[in-house]
Amino acid sequence: MSSMYHRLRYRPVVAVAAVAGVVLAAAACSSSTSASGGSGTGSGGNVTISVDCAPPAAQQPVQHKEWVEDVATFEKANPNITISSVYNYPCDAVPAQFTAMLRAGTETNLYYTYFTDLPQVLLAGQAANITSYVNSTTVPTLNDIVPSALAAYKAGPSLYGLPTSNYTQGLIYNRQLFTQAGLNPNDPPTTWAQVETDATAIAKLGNGIEGWGDYSAGNNGGWHFSSYIDAVGGSMVNNTTAPPTASFNTPAAQQILQALHTLRFTDKAMSPTQGLAWGTLQQQFAAGKLGMYIAAPDDIYNVIVPTDKGNLDDIGMGPLPSLTGTPAGSLSGGNGFAFSPKDSPAQIKAGIKWLDFESLTPGSGYTFNFERQKADGFPVGFPEPQLFDGATEAKVNQLRSQYATIPVSQYTAFVN
């Protein structure tokens, strides 16, 4: 299976409501490799915009081909707009480089950012206010973009960018181990009580098989704990106080910690070896030695299957476990593009038009052209990104199912 790393990638996370989606990466490209900004408005109303995060031919030949196709299609439909691509892989600069770029003001007209980057971008004064340019005419799917994704590019009522991808976490489970343990592989647990029951049954299979896995090294333990807190309607930080205060020492949080303690020390459903860092659980899961753990869908298509050689047919996803069976939220993350404050009005309009074509229209561009993804050998059908609600999300799901190359029914519990 080909990796979709360039298409869907992320690093920082933010807490969102359960209705919010998932964030992933899309990019832009054309002929130029200059990192400087494009021209404002030339003769005859022509405009050039520079866009970073374009996939280089050397590292990502298929993604590069798709990008070039999209640029050609877009420029043919908009002959007054030229896309000047800046090729970089990976497109997310290390924090020090990103900070240096902002301080120097050397960003492209449209530049790649994570959902968590806006405060730093605004502090550096390197974002154009695009509020007056974005509406349901310039971005027809605008009203269906999940609120949390759009909020990542807002400060008060002002909009400084557009999201292009997102993600959220869920329960990844081994359907084969569920069957072997006498459990229903189409009915993953939704409460911590059910997790305990199912994990214990799986652990009883023996042969080094663990029912539940979790991280506790490399900051990953706190990352998962934050997601568990969100799922029960809590938060790690109370932002209503001045200054904000820690808010994770609650009865609900204590119940979650007690559940993990019971899984580890009473049920013996977790590995006796802890201090696990990211990457360990994926390897264990791919080897058929782990029943369940939480992650985003990209763990499957970027790590478990292509890297650790897991069997795609054995994998299912469900929602994050909660105390009630209905998660109130989840850690989510994503990315999109901000606009340079040096952009002219014509460049802002052209940039919005490009993002609408490339990343915000079902069936179009780099993110949602599932027909082309299938033809180019990429896996199609994973429930990511989930950038929309309403009619737009229904259209995305219809196209995703139409061109699916994976068993999409195994992710129904997660999507619903």
Provide a role label for each language-model segment.
Residues 196-200, 242-274:
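Glycine-centered hinge/linker elements that transmit conformational signals in sensory
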Residues 35, 155-164, 169, 179, ...:
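Extracytoplasmic/periplasmic solute-binding protein
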Residues 87-97, 190-196, 273-286:
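Short helix-initiation/N-cap motifs at beta->coil->alpha
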Residues 115-170, 224, 228-231, 314-318:
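Hinge/lid segment of periplasmic solute-binding proteins
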Residues 128-145, 188-190, 211-216, 234-255, ...:
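Short, solvent-exposed loop/beta-turn-alpha elements that line the ligand-binding surface or hinge
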Residues 298-311, 325-416:
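C-terminal lobe and pocket-closing loops
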Residues 2-120, 136-139, 185, 274, ...:
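Conserved N-terminal structural module of periplasmic/extracytoplasmic solute-binding proteins
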